[in-house]
Structures are given as C-alpha cells and as structure tokens.
Amino acid sequence: MYSVEDLLISHGYKLSRKLPAPHEDDGERRQPARTTVPAGPGLLNGCDDGPAALPRGKASPGTGLLSDPESRRLGPRGHGERPSTAAAARISEAGFYHQPVLAWSSQPLTGRSHAYWRRREQEAREDPGGRGPVPSLPTHPREGPWEVGGRSEHVMKKAVWEDELGMAGPARWQDVSVRSWNQPPRLGRQMSDGVGEKLFQDLYPFMLGEHGLTSQSKGKSQSLPRVLSPESLSCMEVPIPLSDGHLPGVPKVPLQPPNCASNLESTRNPKKAGTSAPLPQPRFGRPLKPPSYGSQPHSKAGAENGSYTDSRQLDPGAAHSARTNSARQDLYGPDPGLEPPVYVPPPSYKSPPQPAAHPCPEEAVSRHEGRGRRVPQHPMERPAAGGQPLSGSRGAGSEWGASPCSPVGVPPQPHHTTAYDGSILIIPFDDPRIRHIKLPRPHGFWEDVKLDGAVPAPDPRSLQQEGAVWGPSGKERGPAPADPSPSWLWGQPPRNGENGSSPDQRDPCIVTQRKQPDVSGSPQEYPESLVSSPSPQGESSCEMQTQLRKFEAGLQPKRSSKKKTSETIFCLVSIPVKSESQLPGTDTNNNDLKQSASLQEQSVLSLSSTDLELQALTGSMATRTELPRPDPGGPGRGRQADDLRFPSPAKHRALAWPGPWPGHHFRDQQTQTSFAHEPQSLQPLPGERPGGSPDPVLPPRCLDPAPFEVQMHMALASSDPNQRPGAHSPKSQGSLSPSSNSAFSGSSWPRNQGPVPRASLGQQGSDGPGRRASPVSRGEVIKGETTGPCNSRQLFGQFLLKPVSRRPWDLISQLESFNKELQEEEGSSGSSSDGSGSEDSDTELPWGSCARPAPQLPGLLKDIVPEDPRTRPGRVKSKSESWSEEGRPRSPRPWQAEGRGSVWLSPPGSWIAEDGDREVEDRVAQLAVSPRPVKRAISSGLNDAKPEPPPDPAEQREPLPSQELPGSRGAVELSAAGPPRAGGGEQGSTRAPLSLAGKSRGLSAPDLRSVGLTLVQEHSTSQLAGSPGDANAIEIPPNESLEARAARILGIEVAVESLLPGAQRAGQRRHPEPDGSALRPESPRQEAAASLAQPNESTAPADAFYGRRKCGWTKSPLFVGERDSTRQVPRASEPADVDGAVPTKAPETPPSPLESQPFLPKDVETKPPFRSTLFHFIERTPNLAFSEKKLRNTSRVIESLQEKLVSPPRKADPDRLTRMKEVSSVSRMRLLTSRAADSAEEPKAERGPGAWLGGLVAPSAGHKLSDPQGALSLEADGHPAARRENGGRDFWCPDSYDPSRVERV
C-alpha cells in the first residue's frame, strides 16, 4: 500500500512543517516513535500528533503510534493505559493533543467551551503528566490517532473555543479535559481506536488514501504516518473514527460528537465561524492543518479527500473544523503546501476510507457548524470541514459534540449520526467521486441547489438533520422534507446548508450531498424536483443521493468494511449522474429527467426510510432516469442496454420507480441483475426512450467508470452537451448527453454493451443526423439508442449501486475495474465523452467534445452537427451514422452505406472515405485491440479503392482527428495497431469501415474506444500516410496494441487469450472475411467480450456477443447473423479479405494479397458501403422493421444475461469454444454454400455485406461495384443468411455459437 506520505505527496500534499509546540511538546516523548515522521510534518495537520502523540501521549510509544491501530483497535486498552497516564501525561506532553482532543470532543461545547478547553489545553500542554485525568482515560483508549492529531487539533479547537466562547480556559479546560474533553475526543477517537480501529482495519484499504494514513500512522507506516499523521492522521483519524467509529456500532457515540459538534457548532456557528478563521493557531503552536484546506475553496476540500485528509489530520472534532480551519489558517497558514491544490484522492484510497460514517456526519456537522461558522470560513472552513469533514466535521462532531456523553444534544445527533454514519461512511469514498461529479458542472449546479435557499435552513435544520437525517441511515428522507431543498433528505440538509455555504462540495458527509449539489440535479434522486429546480434537469443529483442512500444502505453494512466496499461501488454509481451537466443542454431529456425528478420526489416521499435509503442508493439513479433503474437490467452487462433503449421509458420508469420487480428497487437501479425484466420493459422504449431509456442503457456497464466517466463527462459537459444536446438533445440524448451518454454510454455501456453504444451512437447520430436525415432512422435510433445512452448516463451510478447489492460482487468488481479503466481510458482518450452509444462517440466525445467538438467533420456534422463529439471523427457516425444514417440515407444507399461513417460528407467518396475512415479507424482501433481486429482492419484496408475515397474524408475529417485529441493518440495507436495492417493498411482503412459497421455495432465499448482512438488514428494514419496502406501501416501495431490497446480500449486488462482468440479467429476466419467477418465481429466481439466479459465475466462472452448486439440486438438476426455471418461470410467467402488481412494474419489463403487487395478493395469497398447500408439499415430495422427480432433477440439477450449473471462467468466458454470451432468451419462451409443461396435473402436480413457492397462500392469509386457487390452481396447476403441460419439463430442462444462470444472465448 502507499504510505500515507506517499499518498499525500502523490496527491499533491506537501507534508507540512512540523508542529512546533505541540510536537515539540509531545516530540520529546514522541519523537522516537515519530522519528520517521518529522514532528512538524507529523503534526502538520495536527494529526501526526496522532501518531506521534500516541507514542508521546502513550506511555508506550509503540502502542501510541504504532499501536495507533491497536490503540484504535484496542482503543480502550491502548488508550486505557494512556488515558490517565499516557493520556494525561501525553496530553500534557503533547500539550493539547491527547487531552484537548478528548476534552474538546467530550465537552458538550456548552458551558465549558473555550475557556475550559483552553485551560485544559494549557494544562495538557503544561501538565504533561498531571493533565491526564481519569476522564481522559476513557477517551484515550481511542485517542491514539485522534489524540495525537485530535489533541493538537483540539488544542487548536480549544483556542478557537476559548476565543469563541471566551470560557475560562483553565476551568473549562481542566474540567472538560479531564471529563468531557477526554471522553469526547475519545468518542471521536474512540470510534477511531476501538470500533473505529476495527472498522479502520476493515476499511483500511479503502481508507488507504487518508484512512490508510491513519492506519500507517498507527504504526504501520510509522514514518509516513507520522509525517502524514499530523496532516493525514488527524484528518484521517477523524474520518476513521467516524468511519470506523461511526461505522461500527460503538463509534456511534463519536458520530454523536460530530453531530453534537454540528449542533454545537451550529449553535456556535458564529463563534466557530468567527473563531475558526481566527483560530488561535499559535496558541498551541502546532500547524495542525494548513489553513489551505480550510482556505482552499470548498470545491477542492469538499471534493478532495486531501481536504478530508487534512481535515482528518487537522481536527478530530468539529472544533477542529472551526478551530483547525482558523488554526490552520493561522497555525497552518504557512502550511498550505500540506494540502494539495485540488486533492481529489483516488477513489481507491479515498473512497472507502472516507466512506467512514463520519464524513457525512462530520460533513453534516461541519456543514452545520460551517453553516454559521463555515459560511464565514466558507472557503477555508468548508475545505476544512469538507476537506476535513471526517476529521473536522467528525472531529468537530467528536470534539464539539465531543462525547457520546456530551449532553449537548449530542445523543439524538449521535444516534442519527450513528445511523447516518453508516450511510455517511461511503461519503469519503464519494468525496473523490463527488469531486468528480462536482468538478464537471456541479459547482454551478450544486451551488445553485445550494444557493437555492438551502443555505439558510440547513444551518439549524442541518444540525437537526444531522441528527435526524444523518442520524438515521435513511434519515435523509426525514430531514429532506425539512430541507428547503430536501433533494437529499439527509444529504440535502447539509447540502442546503453547505450548498449555500458551498460546503457541499467538500462535505464528505455530503459527499452525496456534495454530489447532489454538484449535479444540482444531483439530488435528482430524491430532490430531482428539488434539485431540478436549481438545475433544470435535476442533473445527476440522484447520483449524489444515490451515494447518500448508499451511505445509508451501506452505512449499516458499512459497519462491515465489506459492505462498505459495496457501498463504495454504490458511490461510484451515484456519481455518474451527469445529467446535470448535459441535462440543461438537452431539453428532450429534460422532460424525462424532470419526470424522473418528480417521480423521484414522489418516490422519496412515498418510500419508507429504508426504501428511501435504497432509493438514495439506487433510486436516485432511477429517479434521475426512471428508465435507468430498469435499464440496469436492460443494459445489465451491456446487453440489455440496447433493449433498454427500445423499451419505452415510461415502462422503464414504471419498472424503475415502483420497482415493479419485487426486490428490484435496487436491482433496477443496479440494473445489472434484473436484465430480463428491464429489457422487456425497456423494449417498448422506441419512442419514449429519449429521456429515460438511454440512461438505463448505459448504467449496467458503467458501474465503476461512472464516476470517472461522469467526471469526464462533466468536464466534457460543455462539449458533450454540444454533442448531446446537438445530436441527442432533440431526443433523449440530452439525458444521455448530460452524463450518461458521455460517461456511461461512452465508457460504460459502450464497452459494456458494445452494440448498445452502437445503437446509442447510431441513435445519437440518428438522433442528431439520423433524426434529422430520416425520421425512421432517427426514430429508430432515438427510440432505443439515444435515449438509452441518455438515461444510461443518468443510470450509471444507479447500476453501480445495484450491482453492489444485487449482482455478484465479483462481477461488480470486474465491471467496476473494467469500467473504471475503460472510463479512465476512454476519458483519457475522450472515449467516454460520447459514450452515448458509439465507441466513436465514446472515444471521440471526451476528446471530440473537449478537444474538437465543433471542428468535427463539417460534412459529418451537417446532420450530426448536434452530436458534434459523435461527429468528432466522423466515425462517431460510423456507429451513430451507421444507425442514424442508415435509416436516414436509406433511400440513398450510397449515403446509407457511406453515410454510416461518412454519409455526412456530401461527396459519396467523402462519405465512403468518411465512413471508411471512421470504420477503418473503428476497425483499426479494434485491430489494435486484438490481432483479429488488426487483421480485420487490414482486411478492411484491403480495399484500395475504399481507402482512396476515405483519404478525402479522412483528410476532410483529418481536421477532426487533428482536433480530436484522439487524433494524435488515435494515430499513434493506429500506428500501433496499423503495422499488422500495414500491408493492407489502406485496405484496413477501407475494410475497417466494413468491419466497423458490424464491429462498431457489435462492439459498443471496444469499438467506441477503438474508434475514438483508432478512428483518429485511422484518420490520421489515413491522412498522414497518404496511401491507405501507409496509414494502415501506421496504425497496424495491433500486436503491441492487442493487449495494451485492448486494455486501454476496454479499460480493463483483457486476457491475451481473449484477444488472441480474436487473432486465432482472425486467422481462422481471416480467409473468409477476416476483417469484416472475423476481424470486425471478432474484434468487436472480442473487444466487447473482453470489455463486457471482463466487467461481468459471467456475462462476458454473452455480453460481448450481446453487447455487440446491443445495437444488433435490435437487429438480432442482423447483428448475430450479419455480424457473425459477415464475419464468417468473409471468412468462408472472402479469401480476398483474408488476403487483405494476409499482411496482418491471413491464415487462410493469401492468394495474392496484392491481387486480393485490389479485388478486395473493390469487394471491401463495395462491401463496407453495402454492409454499412444494409447492416446498419438492418440494425436500424431491428429497431424499427426488425423490432420484433430485436425484441425477441433482446429478450433472449436479457435472458442470457440474467443467466450469465446467475451462472458462472464462463459456464458456456468451453461450449462456446467448441461451438466456435464447429461453427467456424460449418459457417465457412455454409457461407460458401449459402453465400449465393442466401444472398438475396440475406442482404436485407443481414444488410451488412450487401449494404456495404452497394453503398460503399458505389461511393468508393465503384470498385467493381457490381462484381464486388455481387460477390459481397452473395458473400454478405448469402453468407449472412447462412450465418444467421447457422449462427444467427444460434447466436441468440447464449450458449449457441456466437462469433462474438466465440471471440471472447
């Protein structure tokens, strides 16, 4: 694990200078234990005092610092010895560390406020040994980290309180120190040391970021912990106490202190606020926490755990928040380095640790405290309280509402907080996540929500709600009504208070709240309407609420670290509610989202506390996109996403809100397990899907990536909205565009449900261009895809939530890690931006949205203009165009075929080039993903003619690649993926479109990603290498890319075997049609399989297969047959393609690669257009004409998905492998046999090869349009017919041979 110091440093924290006085004070005794950690750095946040104070404060330093975990664990034991002796002496030694923290925390903060505490702190400092009264003893057991950091912070707090309360320092200090101070800090710390320690141990991995600091500070990483201990320990210790203490039943009292602190702080808000800023930092001479956290904008502190770390380090109690803030400002004024500029600790360290119950309670406390106190100190206090909510708020709660005994009205709050703590526990985890959501467009939104008038009420109400909302795990509901903007019943109150105060962003407790405000619509879940008012769409508020719910639902479970992890996932789920950012931009979705908001509100009101809790966890997503709730089932695993698109959003909504499935409230929200139900409900979504369905489509797969993607999307919100609102805005792309489309669709369900992104992209394209171009295409696309992604985005978090509770955790973990990686990958590559349904979009949108949203291909943009990002590389259209253009240019086959990728370009050549480039890049991207894709890309490149036209579009679009960040990256990756395709490089470009048509269809996530990256690569390659061959050569390093790119594209480590099967199959099927048939389907399938299967291995193969059919599901025969058929048709009937792929890997017959290439270019050239046209047409048709197939197939897919979820991950893999081999040979024979027989029948059914042939050939320079068309038509049509005969029907059987599944296998 990373040491605290490492973590802090890596996160931008400068280890603060040593705590001068307290550390020196304690340093004498603690220096040895704290040797590794400089006294100053250790005390940096006054937390090192925690680690150092333990040694110093404990007779046995080992027990103190090293025993910090023990102290926390043994709390009573370790502290027991220390409380009277070590605590008294150490506190004295540490000055105020040990005792002050305790006294501070213990004190009810009523009578003995500052004077007493100041006195106590003075005594503690002056009387190293005399000051450890027995009262300190109870506290000391948990004082380990807390005492160290807490004492310092408490000293600071005492100073603050002394100043604030003007109490007789000595009297209050001594009395409280002995009795109240010690106990409350102990409560806060007790939580930390006793149950907190246990929890800490459980959550240690999660708390690694800052909680890890505590743990290390406890003596695991003494050096780092000490260095970080002051900063991170205190901050961390506080959260750990809250997290550990609050999490466990025992620390509930500490929660109470935080709550009490909240109350007290609320009561003393003026004092606290006033004193916080002017905290007497020099008094204790310990720069507990640099004021930077407090000083730093709440957004930073609130969002970053660094802030929390500082907060924790800074102050174990609320006093810490106020006192530390001012003290930090004063004491740590010079220590701003300690806090990172915008420290958003990685969710992995921060999320779970922060999920300590405290963050929320502390947040609430800090929030509540900060309402009065924090508002004045808003920038700093909020960061301190938000940044150090665990330590500050929790510390504040622990110290202010210091002790469970603290009579200040802590009892109610402690209870609430305690209950809430479990809920809150997740918040720290969310904090980084929240930061993610917060970052995109939350500031305005949550500020809006916050400024909603939430500020005034939250103070008192927040205090109460802290007790009420925070207290009850599901209390958020109760408080929510009280809140002016009770979007988050329990998250909202703080949110209101902090919204106004802008603490939301930094409130760990409000992580959810913060998220909520972040999204302004974030409260969407509960306050969809509430938040909706601040933010038109109620944005992703529900995400935030989801986190709150998560906290609540998982907060009790959070007591168990394991549950907390689940909750963490929930957190992830919550964050993606990005609708907020794009919600405003997309009116079409706004309606749906608003409906969701109202539904959310109703649901919140009607649901019971537990239900509300669940709703917050799952319902917020559902509320945000009622469709999304069912959608999780639909896209579940990325397959139902497609279905979700088609089902009517109303149906979705009905399913989602009422939780039509018996236990599916969460299931729906975490849609991953309720696939069959959802798809059914989702299937009706053709028209309604605009608002609700898209969201559902995405979430299933976007479990973990949601936060990242959401963040990405939020960042891309501006561009994404261009794409989304422009492209999807009319439809439900708005919903998609807000957050789902970008993060969920692009990263989550595109990779999760490859076909869905296709559909989504297609729908996006259709929504934007398709819609515009042809109502049918647009309706089709829109019906499922655009809306699907839209809702999916919103639903992303929801699904994460559900998977946590409903789905197998391993699947969730897989999905999480996969999605995370994928999102990170896609986010990096901009893949996540347009996750709406096209990998192009996904990959391109982040880059395209951000880098080149508008500068996309003008021609492409013409119709796709609204979906700028989607148009981003023109191959955004390759998927989206495929779908939308398919329907739109249905009349003009050339348009259709070319328009699929480049139909938007007016010139057929340009279209083809555009399409070819797009598809080639898509293909190349997938090629890079796997040898099979590479071969497919090469095969695609085989068409010289095709690359020729594409160069124009490529160059036309080259600006797009250039503009699109993925352009260079794509070019590079294409280069990486291109080498194998070097021989057929040009053909790769050409072929790729063909493959892309099916592949981007077939593989939403990989394709999107590949396309996003490879498209630009291909474009760049195509353009950079004037000759398509050259471009392909550039983009051909699929071998290198295979794993690397697969990992990048999929965002998850893909087994080489998974990719290699693609290579093998590419080899196997290359001879027939390696690129279009084997490569494209295989690569997408493999990519989708890898992307889908890896996230949910049980559904992995099917997921890849079905995800590929996400769009294809709509056109189940098409997708299955065409994709599979095309794959195998080219295999069996396209040796030329193989030849084209020969350069890469044409295992079958490289008769004459050059000869084949010229022929194949025609063939492929012809084939890609025809295929694009027919295939996409079919794909669209499944949406419309083939809706029955789509529905039936979708049902099958959903069933299969459900089976897979239920059944072992790779149950069918052996079958599939065997069947794959069988079907491969059979399908080759059948392809050869049925190529001619089924050619007429298949073109329509398959519409892939034939469409590509006709559409692409004609636009392509008509390379043997008739001949290739006939050949490909037979090949594609006859083969697809045979294929569908052979595999199409089979494919629908999850265990049936599924090229995509086979690929995956």
UniProtKB/Swiss-Prot annotation:
Skewed-composition ranges (Low complexity): 595-604, 729-748
BP-aspect Gene Ontology terms: cell adhesion; positive regulation of blood vessel endothelial cell proliferation involved in sprouting angiogenesis
Major localisation: other
UniProt KW Phosphoprotein keyword: yes
Record's keyword terms, sorted: Cell adhesion, Cell junction, Phosphoprotein
Signal peptide per UniProt: none
Residue numbers spanned by region Disordered: 13-86, 120-151, 249-419, 450-545, 575-604, 616-795, 818-1005, 1062-1166, 1234-1305
Segments of skewed composition (Polar residues): 530-545, 579-594, 669-683
Cellular-component GO terms for this entry: adherens junction; ruffle membrane
Pfam families the record matches: JCAD
Compartments reported by the entry: Cell junction, Adherens junction
Chain positions found as Phosphoserine: S841, S1004, S1010, S1152, S1239
Ranges of Pro residues composition bias in the record: 337-358
Biased composition (Basic and acidic residues): 21-31, 69-82, 120-129, 140-151, 360-369, 878-889, 945-958, 1276-1288
Protein name: Junctional cadherin 5-associated protein
Record organism: Bos taurus
Gene name of the encoded protein: JCAD
